[in-house]
Amino acid sequence: MPQRTALGNILRPLNSEYGKVAPGWGTTPLMAVFMLLFFVFLLIIIQIYNSSLLLENVQVSWTAATA
């Protein structure tokens, strides 16, 4: 039998739902929405990095700024 520890007793409620699955699709659509938003965010960052998305009055320079 495994040794019981104080940390294990504190974390036990987090593992009480192990093996149980929500019926149907559960939160899958919500996860898909957040994945899509994250993908759009990454696309915008990549476009700014490649200067293919131009922002007015924003200079994109990877050299040190001069005073």
From Swiss-Prot:
It is a single-pass membrane protein. One of the components of the core complex of photosystem II (PSII), required for its stability and/or assembly. PSII is a light-driven water:plastoquinone oxidoreductase that uses light energy to abstract electrons from H(2)O, generating O(2) and a proton gradient subsequently used for ATP formation. It consists of a core antenna complex that captures photons, and an electron transfer chain that converts photonic excitation into a charge separation. Pfam families: PsbH. This is Photosystem II reaction center protein H. It comes from Cyanophora paradoxa. GO terms for biological process: photosynthesis; protein stabilization. The gene is psbH. HAMAP family: PSII_PsbH. It comes from the Eukaryota. The chain crosses the membrane at residues 29-49. PSII is composed of 1 copy each of membrane proteins PsbA, PsbB, PsbC, PsbD, PsbE, PsbF, PsbH, PsbI, PsbJ, PsbK, PsbL, PsbM, PsbT, PsbX, PsbY, PsbZ, Psb30/Ycf12, at least 3 peripheral proteins of the oxygen-evolving complex and a large number of cofactors. It forms dimeric complexes. It is found in: Plastid, Cyanelle thylakoid membrane. The lineage of its organism: Eukaryota, Glaucocystophyceae, Cyanophoraceae, Cyanophora. Belongs to the PsbH family. One of its GO terms (cellular component) is cyanelle thylakoid membrane. InterPro entries: PSII_PsbH, PSII_PsbH_sf. Coiled coil: none annotated. One of its GO terms (molecular function) is phosphate ion binding. Keywords: Cyanelle, Membrane, Photosynthesis, Photosystem II, Plastid, Thylakoid, Transmembrane, Transmembrane helix.
